[in-house]
Amino acid sequence: WMEPAVFAVVLPELFTPENAPRFEAARAIIDTLPEGLPEVSARLAALLLPLGEQGTRKALKQLRCSNALIEEVTTLVREAGLVPEEKTAARAIQARRLLGRLEPDPLRRLLALCAAHRPEQAAAFAALQTAAGRLQAENACCRVGQLAVNGRDLMALGAKPGPGLRGQLEALLEAVITGQLPNERKALLAAVKIELDP
């Protein structure tokens, strides 16, 4: 570890009177996270968490980090307040929604960060990671692009192009994620027909 005095020069935002006490807590969290270059984003997120999303983005820009690293770290900071669902069905829905927003590796890093930050919930975050892994293995539908229908299919039924079309696809995705509809072309098109011709 660098000495706090060095960190204070490199990242002065961390050593304001309100943030300085959080530095030692951040060090303890970072020490529990996996090591290695692929994991640097989770470790940076743990360090910069007290700065919030905008402060993290600003600090990383000052350090001249790559845009990809800045985006991942700020996403991890933004999502770090995640509360894991306890019930199996709710956990599966939560895992699908997370996979809809995050790629698998950033999601794994987020869950590791959350477990390190809140060790009393580590088992719940591990269960959420297991649920996400199972969904990936099943190639479950978690994003609009994974739906069995697309915008052209909806327009063929009479849907108008534009933002409303995207909204219809997102509504179908939500129905699939929550188990109201299967991700099957026939069932999805039938639901759209009902919506277009009430």
Region annotations inferred by a language model:
Residues W1-A123:
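Conserved, hydrophobic alpha-helical core segments of structured domains
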Residues H117-P198:
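Charged substrate- and nucleic-acid-binding regions of tRNA-handling and nucleotidyl-transfer enzymes
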